[in-house]
């Protein structure tokens, strides 16, 4: 008889940082705009954990093992007149993909946004990645006429935590 699968989605904790950074390294290894750098990924996650008003990271555990995560950042939209979210990262470990875990994480994030009265969730996908775009469309996301642009700000102090 097969072991019953125990799947839980819950807020990540600082004890999860190492595993989360490994998931992000795996994600960024496949993205054109970013390079994997475990120290940067750890620093970014710590910045979220130190101020819960900045965002949330949820993990999906299968039988106690983290197999996926979703990272949501909070901001304000003057266009919408309220709080909105940026879905920064959604990643499922390669060995557990195509088993519905990404769907569960995204549905959890959407439910969280609704319960907390966020007005919108925005995300970016790779342009040629039609699989990811189809995945998000299936969950109600629509294309935007907005085109993302970036300006990389180089700093003298690579380890600077804040520029306030």
Please tell me what each predicted stretch does:
Residues 96, 100-108:
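Conserved acetyl-CoA pyrophosphate-binding loop and the N-cap/start of the following alpha-helix
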Residues 113-125:
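Conserved GNAT acetyl-CoA-binding A-motif
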Residues 8-20:
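A short beta-loop-alpha structural element at the N-terminal edge
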Residues 65, 76-87, 97, 144-145:
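A conserved beta-turn-beta hairpin within the catalytic core of GNAT-like acetyltransferases
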Residues 47-59, 86:
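A short helix-loop-beta-strand connector motif used in the catalytic cores of GNAT acetyltransferases and
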Residues 103, 127-145, 151:
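Conserved active-site alpha-helix within GNAT-family acetyltransferase domains
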Residues 59, 65-74:
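Conserved beta-strand in the GNAT
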Residues 22-47:
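Conserved GNAT-fold acetyl-CoA-binding loop/helix
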